[in-house]
From Swiss-Prot:
Name recorded for this polypeptide: Enolase-phosphatase E1
Pathway in which the depicted protein is active: Amino-acid biosynthesis; L-methionine biosynthesis via salvage pathway; L-methionine from S-methyl-5-thio-alpha-D-ribose 1-phosphate: step 3/6; Amino-acid biosynthesis; L-methionine biosynthesis via salvage pathway; L-methionine from S-methyl-5-thio-alpha-D-ribose 1-phosphate: step 4/6
Localisation per UniProt entry: Cytoplasm; Nucleus
InterPro entries, per the entry: Enolase-ppase_E1, ENOPH1_eukaryotes, HAD-like_sf, HAD-SF_hydro_IA, HAD_sf
GO molecular function terms attached to this record: acireductone synthase activity; magnesium ion binding
Entry EC number(s): 3.1.3.77
Cofactor descriptive note: Binds 1 Mg(2+) ion per subunit.
Family of the protein in this entry: Belongs to the HAD-like hydrolase superfamily. MasA/MtnC family.
Bilayer-spanning residue ranges: none
Organism taxonomic ancestry: Eukaryota, Metazoa, Ecdysozoa, Arthropoda, Hexapoda
Length: 249
């Protein structure tokens, strides 16, 4: 199908490598959380939210592994939990309590103005064009819904949150499983064929297509290179410009 033939009621977008540079997450957000975990935990140690996060972190099997590497029995305090959170980040373990902690740290950073969410220049323009055409825009990312909203609310292009109608994270299912996209379509109240999913990951595009969605791959700077098999299986665009004239069916 040619790009000019595409139509949709909902545009479902991935974040990393699609609306936002992969380097923003790995080079800005993750280091910020690592650098500020100790201070955040110290300041909020007595709050119910932080107590819950600490309890969930210390119940992880990875915590048992981590504690066994220490020379002495650890005291559960802010510094120790901050060290454990850095251990998880360095191992790229995206466990739920860590994502919750990171989300709280990022929220503080966004609120103070230290952090601004990266979006590509064409994203805000396309979002506005799709919204003006009556299309809904939804987000599906492995990052928590709270973290998603922060990126778009505090973006370098301004507050894009009013243009977004729904957010999905791994609570709906993993991104390479077809059932996740079926659930998303049901939640949106549309047939899967009326959803256009934009992602940089071929395995996600394949899962969405198997659910009946239309899919387009993004070849943004810094993204993993696409193989000939991928480029023959899916339409590929360098940015959202070619999709700005998308209309409803």
């Amino acid at each position: 199908m040619a790009l000019t033939d595409l139509s949709a009621k909902v545009v479902l977008v991935d974040i990393e490598g699609t609306t936002t540079s992969i380097t923003f997450v790995h080079d800005v957000l993750f280091p910020y959380a690592k650098a500020n975990a100790g201070q955040y935990l110290s300041e909020t140690w007595e709050t119910d939210d932080t107590k819950q996060i600490v309890e969930e972190l210390t119940q992880l099997p990875q915590y048992t592994e981590y504690a066994s590497t220490l020379e002495t029995r650890p005291e559960i305090n802010a510094a120790h939990i901050a060290d454990f959170s850095r251990y998880l980040i360095e191992k790229d373990l995206k466990v739920t309590p860590l994502k919750t902690l990171q989300g709280h740290i990022w929220a503080k950073g966004y609120a103070s103005g230290e952090l601004k969410g990266h979006v590509y220049e064409d994203v805000a323009v396309a979002f506005q064009a799709w919204s003006d055409a009556g299309l809904r825009i939804a987000v599906y990312s492995s990052g928590s819904v709270a973290a998603q909203k922060l990126i778009f609310q505090h973006s370098i292009a301004g507050d894009l949150l009013p243009l977004l109608s729904a957010h999905f994270d791994t609570n709906v299912g993993h991104k390479q499983q077809t059932e996740s996209y079926t659930r998303i379509a049901e939640s949106l109240g549309v047939e899967p064929q009326h959803v256009l999913f934009l992602t940089d990951v071929p395995e996600e595009a394949s899962a969405a297509r198997d659910a009946g969605m239309q899919t387009v791959l993004l070849a943004r700077p810094g993204n993993a290179p696409l193989t000939a098999e991928h480029t023959s299986a899916f339409p590929v665009v360098a940015n959202f410009v070619a999709l700005q004239s998308l209309k409803q069916p």
